[in-house]
Amino acid sequence: MLDIHLLRTQLDHVARLLAERNYVFPLAEFSALEAERKNLQTSTQELQARRNGASKQIGNAKSRGEDASAILAEVAHLGDELKQAESRLDQVQAALQHILLQIPNLPHSSVPEGRSESDNREVRRWGTPPTFDFSPADHVSIGERLGLLDFPTAAKISGARFSLLTGSLAHLHRALAQFMLDVHVREHGYTETYVPYLVNAESLRGTGQLPKFKEDLFEVPRRKTAEPFLENQPVAATLPSNSNSPQGGQDDDDLYLIPTSEVPLSNIVRDRIVDPELLPIKLTAHTPCFRSEAGSYGRDTRGMIRQHQFEKVELVQIVHPAHSYKALEELTGHAEAILQKLKLPYRVMALCTADMGFAAAKTYDIEVWLPQQGTYREISSCSNCEAFQARRMQARFRNEKGKPELLHTLNGSGLAVGRTLVAILENFQNADGSVSIPKVLQGYMGGTERLVPHNA
């Protein structure tokens, strides 16, 4: 969330920066509400002063034995006016808060300006894409030929955008996550963390998913305990409806499946004042992630690239504001290190103003080479959110003067496990249908060097 003081003092500058993000700031609405807020605050202060003055007159009149009924009536009238003014002030402040919660972060000055992903800027490349003396297959064909990847059964069980991995492919998927965690903990200094997979609305507001992106989430409403669960009644019919909630349409008692472990990891410092000696805080977690992909209809419908359920090893850093951009380079390098150890070619892209995520001030995307597509595809997104999330979470530390100051938060994938598996299948495929296992993973696979087709 942006600093309301910044909007009040540099509104035109903020609106211009937001326009670079393709966000149209509701200037007229905000200005009208802000003007009304100022007037109401002045009115409430004046009414309070008048009521206090009249209350003193009552005491003076009674001490002199005079009739105070007129003054009592005036105090009652002023009290009614004050209640009305305070009620309207609460409404106006809630409306301003609603606007604030919809506004994305401001881009850092180093972010390239652009209108679409085509304006993203390449920063560097690593590795050379492999060449094949045969036509490379995509991961779906490879997995099915191995007899270890079954999309039809996954669709039967759950529907579209789910995967079923078996045997050595499921083992390789698990090995990848274990390998990533080991590297980040042992070499990069992160603390492994086990987090809840269900979080409340306040946690999602803290990291910026709510209220703006509710449609991208899987919500798990809680059934009222007083209501019996009827065997033949639709589940939705037994659940309470809270669509009129003032906080963006969600009931704070309801839970949501995490879209990324960034949410629970970052919220560890919500409503806390952190000892500065503990900074930086570096956390990692391996979790499933759940996304509705509401805005992705028709995109990447084949295979594992875009799933409702996938696994990811997440990296989160909580840092002193003066160090956050150094931390962004470090965190991005930690994600890159995984690809380098796996010998997977990739490139790093600096996202332009229009392509960054809602909470980010600056983002690097890491894209891995997929031979069958002949292109690089995102496998990690590493962002510095500056104080944007910390302000929503009230995550602070004490500065040198002993005053609470907002922390800076960073997050990145280190990496998306499923997409890394896809990249291995495609980059290490062989003409006989087998897939070579990267050397750094063979120890996690009991010494297995190749995945071999089931009919070989």
From Swiss-Prot:
Residues binding ATP: 291-293, 378-381
Binding site for L-serine: 260-262, 314, 413
The keyword Transcription is annotated on this UniProt entry: no
GO biological process, one term: seryl-tRNA aminoacylation
Catalytic activity annotation: tRNA(Ser) + L-serine + ATP = L-seryl-tRNA(Ser) + AMP + diphosphate + H(+); tRNA(Sec) + L-serine + ATP = L-seryl-tRNA(Sec) + AMP + diphosphate + H(+)
Keyword ATP-binding in annotation: yes
Database matches in CDD domains: SerRS_core
Compositional bias (Basic and acidic residues): 114-125
Location(s), subcellular: Cytoplasm
GO CC annotations on file: cytoplasm
Family: Belongs to the class-II aminoacyl-tRNA synthetase family. Type-1 seryl-tRNA synthetase subfamily.
Complexes and interactors: Homodimer. The tRNA molecule binds across the dimer.
Known function: Catalyzes the attachment of serine to tRNA(Ser). Is also able to aminoacylate tRNA(Sec) with serine, to form the misacylated tRNA L-seryl-tRNA(Sec), which will be further converted into selenocysteinyl-tRNA(Sec).
Protein name: Serine--tRNA ligase
